Swiss-Prot record:
In eukaryotes there are five DNA polymerases: alpha, beta, gamma, delta, and epsilon which are responsible for different reactions of DNA synthesis. It comes from the Eukaryota. It catalyses: DNA(n) + a 2'-deoxyribonucleoside 5'-triphosphate = DNA(n+1) + diphosphate. Its main location: mitochondrion. Involved in the replication of mitochondrial DNA. Signal peptide: none annotated. It comes from Schizosaccharomyces pombe (strain 972 / ATCC 24843). InterPro entries: DNA-dir_DNA_pol_A_mt, DNA-dir_DNA_pol_A_palm_dom, DNA/RNA_pol_sf, DNApol_Exo, POLG_palm_dom, RNaseH-like_sf. The gene is mip1. Its EC number is 2.7.7.7. It holds the Pfam family DNApol_Exo. It is an enzyme of class 2 (transferase). This is DNA polymerase gamma. It is found in: Mitochondrion.
């Protein structure tokens, strides 16, 4: 029960006694000298979760409270006691008392609607209007002059410095093999067409690094994958935000009609069937009807196919508008010279303009649908914010790329040279047949003698005779066999063994290892461990008479083939002695593979990043010795069905690792002098969201086992989720996280069993299955059927999870996913048509829909954070702008003078966002433990953790640490500097004297309690 704090207090030395006369209760609290902490009694709920202090509660939930029935409370206590989570000591946090920025409405819900609309306008109104207009007729001929040319509705043509419209569709074309900078751009507004031509293209400048000018007053740019077009606009390259905003039709399509990754293979097969059916319509081919039947069968089995398409403009225009785009002209822009472009210039401008027109037609169709699917203004507002991200760099960027590439080439050459030496040595055995046949590695190779090269007529020297395998690897220019660590020859030349058994290549199974048939005990043990034996029927080339062959295990499971035992995922097997070699260079090859894996996969994307330097444009920063540049990430604000942002370099960049070449990538993003990065990671974001969904059924935080473990679990006592899972499985706490998040996203028993066996190769299949079953019974629970009594009460006849720590959560998630039109509980965002149950067969893509419920809610969280920061930056004139977001992480670039105010703004944004989640799920309370970020980072580089030194094989010099500030530390900094958003002062506040329980029970409550009881104790 909660009671109000009395304003009259008696102070004595370091102790303060608060007398609550209403209940004759004496509170004895240690006095704090900090002005932002008071002596109010802690507000701890009936199951032991501390709520917001009275001062914060009254500001975030003004005159609001939440009551639960005694039956709900009793059930929650029984459930927690069953899982040994009741009556644990509460983690006690200070009673904070400071003035928050005022809510922009009577409730936190009103507040978010209003601040979402604040940033959305006037752009939202412009976009709505623009989606209803028709554009002028497209010009047939285009003037050949540099810069912008305006083609007005009345037929007049004029040279303009930039388009003067405040809303337009925009598209650019580049000679991508020559330069990332644009050569042609077209735009269309309600009143005019515009065309921009590069001065370099027309021979008016020697510099191909030409940026496109836009209106300094700002405009709304609509485009398909519009971030690509944004990268070519001059005004976007400045330390200060431009007044432009960008609306991406690709994101609008994905959010309304996008498909998940599991659906795409089916979509491509269906399209192939459709194309075949169309191509035979006019023919008299007997097969034409069967092709059409194929396509109709696809539609019958997968109705969602008629409601979705992949994301390219060509496919989206066809799907929404039945516009057939001819993209063959795109090949002309692959030219290495500008002359071919000039010869077809009018034709190519028309091609670009037709894409622009088609984008507007798509926009007219999809934008109204988007507003129905995502009706909250905060979603629209956040989407615009994501379109404004930017990354500052200096010349350390160039040094990084050059240095890593040089080291990468050196490491590759070191291993390749050794492999070449082994090949040279092995080829000399061509005349020693017995030696080759006795060698389990060399006998796999093709030893057919052949001439190394053709003999010239006048040549006197004999042509060397070599084995056929050597000839295939021979390079004439280098005059030696060139063999890389990725080659199939490498494991053979390195004499690799799996558990002391030679490796062999199978075209069917990939890399396998041979065990002599006489080793029956070992064969039985390998079968118990789940290793897959090879079948003679599948691959007849292996020697099954003397050996049993097993597939080399793969991290993706028994179905996957090992393509290279020298890839980074096999390094741990080498260190554990499972994978062996006679040669030291094998270890080097594996180390190189692990070290270079990041750079080899990302180098093309990293090296092709478009950097605009201070010599190219006025970037708003004083010149410095180390220079200054800006990268605009090519981000799709809503690139997945869960509305997550997508970008292929910065949103997928790994954190720096000591053995990973080039992994210091993010730390190459550096704030210029006078600026700093301020950011934070949301603590256990998705875990808290699903726990809240479970707790909301009781209207009490910590009512479910998962909720209690998330809010009050202690690592030291083993009561947090990861420690509990680690204890069940006998794995480390870090390993347990993989199992927990995998289960949350739909991983089943099969995947968990496989993961256990990967972590412990000695574990038998039966043992791993038993452990996995034990984990799922304890967490997700067991499948139960709805009893007749519950059905008579009006509950549907279905199965549900019961008795587990997470049963309440999974039942809630699955119930959400099975709704005809599921929506996120917070911002009311709907699922795409491709995953809507009305367009699916029964239970189809259930895992994807459950994932959608979780991840889409997490996207709502990010959007609310961004909208909150937009409001606070504007209201308090903070010198800050969004730099980058990565799912549960936000980073702002702030001036040094405002960095602590921005840090405080982030804490307020998090408090508001968590509170809004709670209110939307029916609880007008917020646990103190999650109200604020555990810390806000203030740093001069971009990195996951301010304490990371970012030392890697390519970066030997540690990067100095940044600051890591808790909410108390931030408040202390503001107090010391005399800065804050609102005056840093305590406020008088009261919390109503009300019990948390209510005797009122409705019939609906009885039904819900009966179902909750079944989930807990069935």
């Amino acid at each position: 029960m909660f009671y109000k704090a009395c304003p009259s207090t008696l102070t004595c030395s370091k102790w303060i006694h608060s007398i609550i006369k209403t209940k004759k209760f004496l509170y004895c609290r240690h006095y704090s000298s900090k002005s932002f902490i008071d002596n109010a009694p802690l507000r701890i709920n009936p199951v032991g979760v501390q709520y917001l202090s009275p001062a914060l509660q009254n500001q975030v939930f003004p005159q609001q409270n939440t009551q639960i029935s005694q039956l709900h409370l009793d059930l929650a206590k029984f459930h927690l006691a069953k899982h040994q989570l009741l009556n644990k000591e509460t983690i006690k946090l200070p009673s904070f008392n400071f003035r928050l920025p005022p809510l922009q409405g009577k409730t936190i819900s009103e507040h978010f609607y209003n601040i979402g609309l604040e940033f959305a306008e006037p752009h939202l109104s412009k976009a709505i209007k623009f989606s209803k207009i028709d554009t002028p007729v497209q010009p047939k001929t285009w003037k050949r002059q540099p810069g912008w040319t305006k083609y007005a509705k009345d037929g007049s043509i004029s040279c303009v410095p930039y388009p003067d419209s405040d809303c337009m569709v925009f598209d650019v074309e580049v000679l991508y093999k020559v330069s990332p900078f644009a050569v042609v751009a077209t735009a269309v507004s309600e009143d005019a067409w515009y065309c921009w031509l590069s001065p370099w293209l027309l021979g008016k400048s020697e510099n191909d690094r030409q940026l496109i000018p836009s209106n300094p007053k700002g405009a709304l740019f609509v485009g398909h994958n519009v971030s690509f077009d944004r990268q070519r606009i001059r005004e976007e390259y400045n330390i200060k935000s431009s007044r432009n905003v960008f609306l991406d039709t690709m994101s609008l399509h994905v959010a309304t009609h996008g498909m998940c990754s599991r659906q795409k293979p089916t979509w491509f097969k269906a399209r192939k069937a459709y194309i075949r059916s169309q191509s035979t319509e006019t023919s008299e081919d007997d097969d034409s009807s069967s092709f059409d039947d194929d396509y109709q069968n696809y539609l019958k089995q997968e109705p969602w196919l008629a409601h979705s398409s992949v994301n390219s403009l060509k496919d989206v225009a066809k799907f929404h508008c039945n516009i057939t785009l001819d993209k063959s002209k795109r090949d002309d822009f692959a030219s290495l010279e500008k002359e071919p472009i000039l010869q077809k210039l009018n034709e190519l401008i028309t091609y670009c303009a037709h894409d622009t027109y088609s984008t507007h037609q798509v926009f007219k169709k999809v934008f109204p649908q988007f507003l129905e699917v995502c009706p909250h203004p905060a979603t629209f507002s956040a989407m615009l914010s994501l379109g404004s991200v930017f990354l500052p760099v200096n010349h350390s960027w160039t040094r990084y790329i050059n240095g890593v590439e040089e080291q990468y080439q050196q490491m590759i050459q070191l291993v390749d040279q050794k492999l070449s030496q082994y090949a040279e040595k092995a080829k000399d055995l061509i005349n020693t047949k017995d030696t080759v046949l006795k060698d389990p590695w060399l006998r796999q190779l093709d030893w057919t003698p052949c001439n190394l090269y053709r003999k010239l007529k006048k040549a006197t020297q004999e042509v060397p005779v070599v084995p056929k395998w050597y000839k295939k690897a021979y390079c004439k220019t280098e005059k030696r066999a060139v063999i890389t660590a990725k080659s199939r020859l490498a494991p053979i030349l390195l004499r690799l063994k799996w558990k002391k058994h030679p490796l062999a290549w199978s075209d069917t199974y990939g890399w396998v290892f041979s065990v002599e048939r006489t080793s029956k005990d070992e064969i039985e043990m390998l079968l118990d461990q789940g290793l897959v034996p090879c079948s003679r029927e599948e691959d007849t080339k292996l020697d099954y008479n003397n050996y049993i062959f097993f597939k080399v295990p793969h991290k993706d499971g028994p179905e996957a083939r090992c393509g290279s035992p020298l890839s980074k995922s096999y390094q741990r097997y080498f260190e554990e002695g499972i994978l062996q070699s006679d040669y030291e260079v094998a270890k080097k090859a594996l180390e190189m593979s692990a070290s270079c894996s990041y750079w080899s996969s990302a180098r093309d994307r990293i090296r092709s990043q478009m950097v605009v330097w201070d010599k190219d444009a006025e970037l708003g920063v004083p010149s410095s010795v180390d220079g200054f540049g800006i990268i605009l990430p090519c981000i799709i604000p809503m690139g997945t069905v869960t509305r997550r942002a997508v970008e292929n370099t910065w949103l997928t960049a790994s954190n720096s690792k000591k053995n990973r070449l080039g992994s210091e990538l993010k730390a190459m993003i550096r704030a210029p002098d006078g600026y700093t990065f301020v950011g934070a990671d949301v603590d256990s974001e998705e875990l808290w969201i699903v726990a809240l969904m479970g707790d909301s059924q009781f209207r009490l935080h910590g009512a479910t086992a998962l909720g209690m473990m998330t809010l009050e679990g202690k690592k030291s006592e083993g009561t947090d989720l990861h420690s509990k899972t680690a204890a069940i499985l006998g794995v480390s706490r870090d390993s347990a996280k993989v199992f927990n998040y995998g289960r949350l996203y739909g991983a089943g028993l099969k995947h968990t069993t496989l993961l256990l066996m990967q972590m412990n190769p000695t574990l038998k299949t039966a043992e791993a299955k038993e452990l996995a079953k034990k984990l799922y019974a304890s967490t997700k629970g067991v499948k139960s059927k709805m009893s007749k009594r519950l059905q008579e009460m009006g509950l549907p006849k279905l199965t549900f999870w019961s008795q587990g720590t997470e049963s309440f959560v999974f039942n809630k998630l699955e119930a959400m996913a099975q709704l005809p039109s599921p929506r996120t509980p917070v911002l009311d965002a709907g699922i795409t048509q491709a995953l809507s149950s009305k367009n699916l067969s029964k239970n189809s893509f259930m895992t994807s829909r459950v994932n959608w419920a979780i991840q889409s809610s997490a996207v709502d969280y990010l959007h609310l954070l961004l909208v909150s920061m937009n409001h606070l930056i504007k209201k308090y004139y903070l010198e800050a702008r969004l730099s980058l977001t990565v799912h549960d992480e936000v980073r702002y670039l702030s001036s040094d003078k405002d960095k602590y105010r921005v840090a405080f703004a982030l804490q307020v944004a998090n408090l508001w966002t968590r509170a809004f989640f709670c209110q939307r799920l029916g609880i007008n309370e917020l646990p103190q433990s999650v109200a604020f970020f555990s810390s806000v980072d203030i740093d001069h580089v971009l990195r996951k953790d301010v304490k990371m030194d970012c030392v890697t094989p390519s970066n030997k010099v540690p990067i100095p640490p940044g600051e890591e500030l808790t909410i108390e530390s931030v408040l202390e900094k503001l107090e010391q500097s005399g800065q804050s958003l609102e005056p840093l002062e305590q406020i008088q506040c009261f919390v109503d004297v009300k019990a948390t329980t209510s005797a009122e029970i409705t019939e609906e409550d009885k039904k819900n309690i009966a179902y909750l009881k079944a989930q807990a104790f069935y």
